[in-house]
């Protein structure tokens, strides 16, 4: 099960790096659009409170639909709303992009960690997943710093969107591969 576990870990890394790559620069993106720090602080506070609902969805859904379906839905929505940051000059879209990407973050990560937990009985993969998750969280802003420069937000938005969609594909591949290994 090393191959599917590696795919799941790569998916987790991409999800965290992609989200954090944009999240780390969202205030700068907002300032670039002419929003004040006070406005951005209030907007992001409300968006983060809304984001809590993602974790509540996990609580209510559990594994009723498995892990692959919620991960796929979460990454598709996250990718779509990350792409929406291209229209950050429209206040309502900027808010919705922040809120919904926050919801998908709180929703998808538990399923990715749960997927990692399915690959061994002793919990080694999921323990390593904690490390991989943190590496993704640290790498996103690093990559962002290399590409944003003087307001080049388009590149980080596109990279993050691509990373999120690739995350979904890797997670599905991991689940399908794990089932093939289990059937042997």
Task: Give the location of each predicted region.
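A late C-terminal transmembrane helix in Major Facilitator Superfamily
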Residues: 119-153, 160
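Multi-pass alpha-helical transporter architecture, strongest
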Residues: 158-184
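Extracytoplasmic gate region of multi-pass secondary transporters
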Residues: 4-45
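Transmembrane alpha-helical segments of major facilitator superfamily
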Residues: 42-51, 101, 129, 133
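Helix-to-loop junctions at the C-terminal end of transmembrane segments
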Residues: 54-67, 148
